[in-house]
Curated annotation (Swiss-Prot):
Keywords: Plasmid
Encoding gene (name): rhiA
Domain of life: Bacteria
Organism: Rhizobium leguminosarum bv. viciae
Job of this protein: May be involved in plant-microbe interaction.
Name assigned to this protein: Protein RhiA
Length: 231
């Protein structure tokens, strides 16, 4: 059996691209895909997460894409997305590994365009419409003075699903510099938005896209290691 899960939202990304420079709009329009096959000895939940080049204190990676059920031996799942960035927030309580981050609000943004937002509780918790600000190339979230500590979390996502999040708090500033690094993994008890403890993830491998390659195939082998090649 093969399942295809697409996170490409044409209407959303066209709108987000409309105000961006040509080069940024072109990049955001590129579709990527990962086809993950299970040739191991048992069923697994397959998921994809992003990982920062260097660890950043109090910033957590999320299970970005995740199979909705275990993938049986001999079956596969395909994830498709675009380089379309978003701001996200959630009422998580204290942000620790194992907590589920459900994006209660999403705002489209771009590192080269509208890259700055404010998270506030005025008229209910939420993010303001992004505006262009400094520094260019980063995504910035300002927490307002009415944001309590250890209640909400904010972060960034791609194709409408969270990738990195941090605990929100009174007058805090969060600056994210997007450097997509895709990792695939096989596990259990994982869902979209699960807050991950990167150091404890097993059966994982980075999925590197070579120049001009946008589709990869990852095969979980009998020894529970991943073999990754262009599609």
């Amino acid at each position: 059996m093969s399942l295809h899960v697409s996170y490409v939202d044409k209407e959303m990304t066209d709108h987000a691209r409309a105000s961006q420079p040509g080069s940024a709009a072109l990049a955001q329009g590129t579709q990527y895909s990962l086809l993950l096959k299970n040739q191991s000895a048992q069923p697994w939940t397959f998921y994809v997460y992003q990982k920062m080049p260097q660890p950043v204190a109090n910033v957590f990676s999320l299970a970005w894409f995740c199979s909705p059920y275990q993938i049986r031996v001999g079956n596969q799942i395909k994830f498709t997305w675009e380089l379309a960035y978003n701001f996200v927030w959630s009422d998580t309580g204290q942000l620790i590994p194992g907590v589920d981050f459900f994006a209660s609000g999403v705002e489209d943004c771009s590192p080269s365009g509208r890259n700055t937002t404010t998270f506030s509780l005025s008229d209910g918790p939420g993010l303001t419409a992004p505006i262009k600000g400094d520094p260019a190339g980063s995504l910035v979230i300002n927490d307002a003075g009415n944001v309590p500590n250890n209640r909400f979390s904010v972060g960034i996502g791609m194709s409408g699903t969270g990738t990195y999040v941090a605990q929100a708090g009174t007058n805090l500033l969060h600056t994210f510099t997007p450097t997509p690094s895709y990792w695939i993994a096989a596990g259990t008890n994982v869902t979209i938005g699960s807050v991950l403890s990167i150091d404890t993830i097993t059966q994982t491998r980075e999925a590197k896209f070579p120049s001009a390659v946008f589709n990869l195939v990852g095969v979980l082998q009998e020894d529970n290691t991943w073999d990754i090649n262009p599609a």
